[in-house]
UniProtKB/Swiss-Prot annotation:
InterPro entries hit by this protein: ATP-grasp (IPR011761), ATP_grasp_subdomain_1 (IPR013815), D-Ala_lig_Van_CS (IPR000291), D_ala_D_ala (IPR005905), Dala_Dala_lig_C (IPR011095), Dala_Dala_lig_N (IPR011127), PreATP-grasp_dom_sf (IPR016185)
Protein name according to UniProt: D-alanine--D-alanine ligase
Residue ranges of domain ATP-grasp in the record: 102-302
Pfam families, A to Z: Dala_Dala_lig_C (PF07478), Dala_Dala_lig_N (PF01820)
Organism (species): Sinorhizobium medicae (strain WSM419)
Length: 308
């Protein structure tokens, strides 16, 4: 039994709060099962004071979205000198900004789709690029605010310029890549197995596909050629290293194999705070590699540090 005191950060105040509560609760329960002394911290604006009073040995970061995975909480933990899991300040901030992460990935030789970044308020009656394309908020997760513009749409969707839009003014317009969706986790300096994600009843891997029971089917190991499987693993590890991630990350890909030849493999984005319930993608990959959920979390706790 470990004598370490682990504070699990969960909840928070981003749009991904429900996801974080699920991840954090699952992690806290599993870590208690591994013998750690666990305190659950539902994060508010007083989190620094709460942690100063608790003085845990390690913080397990189960937050998602802005504040939790954009370098903000990581900076607080560095200042408090409390070791923590997942990526550090710079990598977290960089990965949270889809446009900047794409620049770094492209510079590292990772294939990406063409994209432009713009202010949503300048989204007029003309398409910013030839459809089909995807509109993504630059700094959101869980597919919040993602809009697919199809080939036959004569005008851009009005929802993007609507006053009801809640996902920030900076958006990225990216060429739509047809085909299959794959994802690959990285644990330290090792790429885990590749999973194919098959949305059930949805056009793409949206919020419901990710979090509603039966919303998607996960196939691991992915049924794809050995060459493409290995290439996905290589690119996931390369993205993890280029962006400077630590601990665990997950990269998402699209693979269009409809034409002649091997097909087009495109890196979409990296997630430095992937979902952490037993049925989430990365824990499934760890299980495929022979690690129980609790063992996987134990590795993350023992890997925790400052100056990440």
């Amino acid at each position: 039994m470990s004598s370490k005191h682990v504070a699990v950060l969960l909840g928070g105040f981003s749009s991904e709060r429900p996801v974080s509560l699920s991840s954090g609760t699952a992690c806290a329960d599993a870590l208690e099962g591994e013998g750690y002394r666990v305190t659950r911290v539902d994060v508010g604006h007083d989190v620094a004071a709460v942690l100063q009073e608790l003085r845990p040995d390690v913080v397990f970061n189960a937050l998602h979205g802005p504040f939790g995975e954009d370098g903000t909480i990581q900076g607080i933990l560095e200042y408090l000198e409390i070791p923590y899991t997942h990526s550090g300040v710079l990598a977290s901030a960089l990965a949270m900004d889809k446009a900047q992460a794409k620049h770094v990935a492209k510079a590292a030789g990772i294939p990406v789709a063409e994209a432009v970044v713009m202010d949503r308020r300048s989204f007029g009656n003309q398409h910013p690029m030839k459809p089909p394309y995807v509109v993504k908020p630059v700094r959101e997760g869980s597919s919040f605010g993602v809009v697919i513009v199809k080939e036959d749409q004569s005008h851009p969707p009005q929802v993007i310029t609507s006053s009801d839009w809640r996902y920030g003014d900076r958006i990225m317009v990216e060429r739509y890549v047809a085909g299959r969706e794959f994802t690959c986790g990285v644990m330290g300096d090792v790429a885990l197995g590749v999973t194919e994600i098959i949305p059930q009843g949805h056009a793409f891997y949206d919020y419901d596909s990710k979090y509603v029971k039966g919303g998607s089917k996960h196939v691991i190991p992915a049924q794809v050629s050995p060459n493409i499987y290995q290439k996905i693993q290589t690119l996931a590890l390369k993205a993890h290293q280029a962006i400077g991630c630590r601990g665990v990350s997950r990269s998402d890909f699209r693979f269009d194999d409809r034409g002649d030849g091997e097909g087009e493999l495109i890196w979409l984005e990296i997630n430095t705070q992937p979902g952490m319930t037993p049925t989430s993608l990365v824990p499934e990959m760890a299980q495929h590699a022979g690690l129980r959920f609790g063992e996987f979390l134990r590795w993350m706790v023992e890997d925790a540090s400052c100056l990440r």
